[in-house]
């Protein structure tokens, strides 16, 4: 990746093969998330895992992922600590439709002082209506969408606008949390909404 000018690396285990198209693919568990981060960190220091020198060393800015809303919640913070120790510099979070859980997660990171070592980047998803909310709730591992979030959009006379306003509220709340330094925005709308969000967020 470094040879092609790619310096930002987000290291993650990923979903189980049963969540993809090739459900009978072989699972590979040689490395977990923190171990993969440690491999990248070692390479960036100019060494292979064997200790042999790597010259020139790749320039890598290494990140990790975590789900702030999935139990067990205390374990999630412990995993972040392991990833920071392994060398992660940014933490991209799974989309959370539970502001209270996201806030508790971020405060837990700050209480351990990890926010001084890693940038927290929550995910925000721009959608046009209720269908993506139901899809994520039913089909995407690790995502739990509260019924009140679904109902607010579904019962609106203008689902597209209500979905946007709700997303804006989630984004504003996320940016107000301690340790948060930005947002990862996924845009399923493919219109001018992303520009509107950036403008509304200031």
Where are these predicted regions, by residue range?
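Conserved, mostly hydrophobic/aromatic
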Residues: 1, 83, 87, 122, ...
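A generic, well-ordered mixed alpha/beta core segment in the N-terminal half of proteins
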Residues: 2-17
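Short, well-ordered coil/turn segments that N-cap beta-strands
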Residues: 5-7, 57-60, 88-89, 114-118, ...
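Active-site pocket-lining/capping segments in soluble small-molecule metabolic enzymes
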Residues: 14, 27-55, 65-70, 112-170, ...
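Short, well-ordered secondary-structure micro-motifs
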Residues: 21-22, 73-75, 103-104, 131-140, ...
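Short, acidic/polar
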Residues: 72-83, 164-174
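Catalytic beta/alpha-barrel core
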Residues: 89-98, 182-187
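C-terminal/domain-terminus segments
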Residues: 177, 185-202
